[in-house]
Amino acid sequence: MKARGCGSGGGPGSGQPRIEHRAGPSSGPGRSASTKQNTAGASPARNAARAARVDALVKKIGFLSFGHWSSSPGSHTRSASDALLQSIDLAVAAEELGADGAYFRVHHFARQLGSPFPLLAAVGARTSRIEIGTAVIDMRYENPLYMAEDAGAADLISGGRLQLGISRGSPEQVIDGWRYFGYQPQEGQTDADMARGHAQVLLEVLRGEGFAQPNPRPMFPNPPGLLRLEPHSQGLRERIWWGAASQRTATWAAELGLNLQSSTLINNESDKPFHLQQAEQIQAFRDAWRTAGHEREPRVSVSRSIFALVDDRDRAYFGRQNQDTDQIGFIDATTQAIFGRTYAAEPDVLIQQLKEDEAIAAADTLLLTVPSQLGVDYNAHVIDSILTHVAPALGWR
């Protein structure tokens, strides 16, 4: 039986889903203006230092949808078909608005997106620039070889735009749901060990090296040597992310050369505010990355629930949701988690609040969690409000 996934890190917020993404080389208005000012009367070294500071502010901004559907009053996604088709339409709209990423959360045994690769392939076929990804797929449920084939196909359809977030997964709708998919931790293993083992197999086969002994009398002619999985998409291995809830797993991800996704909740590992704990997790990841000696620079994304109140609809939906404190609770019998606040305010207030968020500052990618049940038009408005009224003032654009 095939396996699909869910993941670590989600978002409370609006009673519906939330989002996150990174910085790229494109030169938005803030970047080009700063670069122009820096070139006059300054040394090349000083110009380079200033440009580096500007680049550090620029962020890729995408959305993260949990893909809920329900027949509750006011829901625009009343069926699985609605949720899937509107997810595609929102990705198209986000690309037209200038957003950088369309990401989807995966959950099993729930009225949410459970099988991401058909959706990712469809989004890839309908768009041309935007990154498409997951945040995250639960590797406890996954056959890593079949997953590599699905991911390779989706990546090729999109022209190499897949950003695949995977993780150990979060508490599920059912008890030990992976058992129904045919998986069971080996003796002495935890389900987290099993998930990390599946992830390591996935990373190995994504390298594209042959490992399977060919049949001497095959149905079709084989190339020489051991055979690899097909279709293989070159470069996908470098676009795998790990959704880490703790500093320990963030360090593990860095050692393996995975990018980092950190969401709207993480393990509560100190008495510090959420954004500071998350910033420390990111720093631990970057330190471990440097120690590992990887040649490329890693990417880091954080997810946030951010709503700019620019019209009466915004105030009606989110005017009372500006939670100025973090929340702490148990996500299972033993794990205490800290949930990040929801940002909902007028743009000028939001700008000041977001300047203080050290984890956002440390990330190159911001994913905005969206209330998908409110429909494509409203969610496009939510994304556009951040891109237009907030991001430029913070140097993100």
What are these regions (language model features)?
Residues K2-A49:
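Compositionally biased, low-complexity flexible segments
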Residues N47-I130:
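N-terminal beta1-alpha1-beta2 module of alpha/beta enzyme domains
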Residues R50-L57, P185-L229, S262-S263, S270-D364, ...:
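An alpha-helical appendage that flanks or caps ligand/catalytic pockets
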Residues I61, G98, V106, V123, ...:
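Conserved, mostly hydrophobic/aromatic
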Residues I61-S65, A102-F104, I132-A135, L162-I166, ...:
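Hydrophobic faces of well-ordered beta-strands that scaffold small-molecule active sites
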